[in-house]
């Protein structure tokens, strides 16, 4: 009888835990869905696993629901991450190289796309817990290079900051400022490699 009671209690706690995770994921998706369009400047801080600030950067973030995402880092080195909803492009103008991946295959290592995604298959790749306005996402697959992805978004759906923590402990924090909700053209989220740019098309693999 005692073993049965303990087993029942354990199953109850597990059920409550799964319910809490589901509620946190639903709450996060609901908050993100409140803002269809967002443009902002960001300040990036890279911190090593030992807690030392190793790099500062800045750039611009533009998102449009559903599924459109553009993040341009201006300093210390220009890079672009662009999603048209199907393909995720990683462009490095300095070396004239771009990598193309299917979004569905990139979510595991590039959780940024979740900021605009309604796709359940994307969200199922992460567990979500909530601490006030901060949501902590952890990948369900051990193959991910990401340890966790933190999103701070208020009850009105305003994205304040987000960060990635890699398995080695390095953290990339992006703090947003000068946030606007002006209309954005879909063309901002299209990428066409210029002549001379080397393309690593991983969609064919």
Swiss-Prot record:
Database matches in CDD domains: LolA
Entry's Gene Ontology cellular component terms: outer membrane-bounded periplasmic space
Signal peptide: 1-22
Biological process terms in GO annotation: lipoprotein localization to outer membrane; lipoprotein transport
InterPro entries: LolA/LolB/LppX, OM_lipoprot_carrier_LolA-like, OM_lipoprot_carrier_LolA_Pbac
Cellular location(s): Periplasm
Keywords: Chaperone, Periplasm, Protein transport, Signal, Transport
PANTHER family in the cross-refs: OUTER-MEMBRANE LIPOPROTEIN CARRIER PROTEIN
Protein's job: Participates in the translocation of lipoproteins from the inner membrane to the outer membrane. Only forms a complex with a lipoprotein if the residue after the N-terminal Cys is not an aspartate (The Asp acts as a targeting signal to indicate that the lipoprotein should stay in the inner membrane).
Family statement: Belongs to the LolA family.
NCBIfam families reported for this sequence: lolA (TIGR00547)
Subunit structure: Monomer.
Name of this protein: Outer-membrane lipoprotein carrier protein
Organism: Haemophilus influenzae (strain ATCC 51907 / DSM 11121 / KW20 / Rd)
């Amino acid at each position: 009888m005692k073993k049965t009671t303990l087993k029942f209690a354990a199953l109850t706690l597990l059920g409550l835990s799964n319910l809490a995770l589901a509620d946190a994921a639903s709450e996060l998706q609901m908050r993100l869905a409140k803002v269809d369009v967002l443009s902002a400047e960001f300040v990036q801080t890279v911190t090593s696993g030992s807690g030392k600030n190793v790099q500062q950067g800045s750039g611009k973030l533009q998102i449009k629901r559903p599924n459109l995402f553009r993040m341009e880092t201006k300093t210390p080195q220009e890079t672009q991450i662009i999603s048209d909803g199907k393909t995720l492009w990683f462009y490095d103008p300095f070396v004239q190289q771009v990598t193309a991946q299917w979004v569905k295959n990139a979510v595991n290592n590039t959780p940024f796309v979740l900021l605009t995604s309604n796709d359940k298959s994307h969200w199922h790749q992460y567990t979500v817990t909530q601490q006030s306005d901060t949501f902590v996402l952890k990948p369900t697959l051990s193959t991910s290079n990401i340890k966790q992805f933190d999103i701070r978004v208020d009850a009105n759906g305003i994205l304040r900051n987000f960060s990635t923590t890699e398995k080695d402990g390095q953290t990339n924090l992006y703090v947003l400022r000068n946030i606007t909700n002006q209309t954005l053209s879909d063309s901002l989220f299209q990428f066409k490699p210029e002549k001379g740019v080397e393309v690593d098309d991983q969609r064919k693999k």
